[in-house]
């Protein structure tokens, strides 16, 4: 026999506690999120507004005027590394933007009287700057990236085009390669050859600013007095020895042909070579020039000519004769071009073909 148990109408259903726990958990999550927001957002925002060290505060402290002033001040104090950090990225060669080169510049042309106007613009602001380089006033315009804290305007440049094939120093700093352009700070720059036998032809010290860098004359090389002295020391004794030789081939790459164009023959050992006083003076005072493609190969071709006499034989007759350009090969009637490679430790004279 079975009985069906039924709940009485007066008893309410038993309530579940699951909803209560879910509600309490949601409240806890809200509280935790609120705390995180307060700690990270509100507090940091409050610090920034009150001059704290947040990123926005750092940006607000660096105005365009401040950045430009700090940049020029760093240059004026010889702090090249600090000044470079305030420049925007560049693909140009900056190997001359060193403390050594800058400090050398300041000994001749100090940067003084720095003044920067209030900026115009937004994140990239424009300021006018004035300063003096060695007492000479300079007025320039800088574009400043306020957000990045850098100067966007390109720096002055020093062009060394024309100085290829030889090591060059600028303010005592050796550059890896001449014949190119280098970024520099505004200032005074002394350009010199690292090889003592060569030097800059003309003015070697220039003041460079952004407005003047395009107007600097092209540099070129000439043989220094040390190079002239070395050339004469090496070349003149050899040339004189060749003049004194009685042989058809005296050396100096100026051998005579033993058979003249008119059929006469020259007797070896009877040749006399005589320079006039004018031509002797050319030899004694020769001034070489640097090579066009390889400047360390210095040379001279105007060493003077000379008169050539000797014993000539025609058929059965012999006698002294004088050689003229019309009756003998040109070679042997004058000194050929003499050259010397001053890049070598002990350079030797090379007598080239006429």
State where each predicted segment sits.
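Short loop/turn and low-complexity linker motifs enriched in small/turn-promoting residues
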Residues: 69, 80-81, 85-99, 103-354
């Amino acid at each position: 026999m079975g009985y069906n148990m039924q709940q009485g109408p007066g008893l309410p259903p038993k309530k579940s506690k699951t909803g209560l726990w879910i509600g309490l958990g949601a409240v806890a999550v809200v509280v935790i999120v609120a705390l995180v927001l307060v700690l990270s957002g509100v507090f940091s925002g409050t610090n920034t507004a009150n001059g704290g060290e947040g990123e926005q505060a750092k940006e607000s402290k660096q105005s365009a005027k401040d950045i430009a002033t700090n940049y020029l001040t760093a240059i004026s104090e010889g702090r090249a590394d600090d000044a470079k950090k305030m420049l925007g990225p560049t693909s140009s060669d900056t190997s001359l933007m060193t403390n050594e080169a800058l400090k050398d510049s300041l000994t001749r042309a100090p940067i003084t009287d720095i003044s920067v106007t209030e900026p115009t613009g937004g994140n990239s602001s424009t300021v006018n700057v004035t300063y003096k380089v060695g007492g000479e006033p300079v007025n320039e315009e800088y574009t400043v990236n306020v957000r990045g804290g850098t100067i966007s305007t390109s720096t002055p440049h020093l062009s060394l085009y024309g100085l290829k094939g030889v090591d060059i120093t600028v303010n005592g700093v050796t550059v890896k390669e001449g014949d190119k352009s280098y970024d520099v700070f505004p200032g005074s720059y002394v350009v010199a050859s690292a090889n003592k036998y060569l030097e800059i032809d003309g003015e070697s010290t220039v003041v460079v600013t952004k407005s003047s860098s395009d107007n600097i004359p092209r540099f070129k090389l000439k043989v220094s007095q040390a190079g002239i002295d070395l050339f004469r020391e090496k070349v003149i004794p050899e040339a004189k020895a060749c003049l004194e030789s009685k042989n058809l081939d005296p050396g100096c790459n100026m051998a005579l042909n033993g058979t003249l164009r008119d059929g006469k023959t020259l007797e070896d050992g009877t040749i006399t070579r005589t320079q006039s006083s004018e031509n002797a003076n050319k030899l004694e005072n020769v001034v070489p020039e640097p090579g066009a493609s390889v400047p360390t190969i210095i040379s001279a071709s105007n060493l003077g000519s000379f008169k050539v006499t000797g014993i000539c034989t025609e058929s059965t007759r012999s006698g002294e004769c004088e050689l003229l350009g019309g009756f003998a090969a040109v070679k042997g009637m004058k000194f050929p071009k003499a050259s010397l490679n001053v890049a070598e430790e002990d350079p030797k004279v090379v007598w080239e073909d006429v």
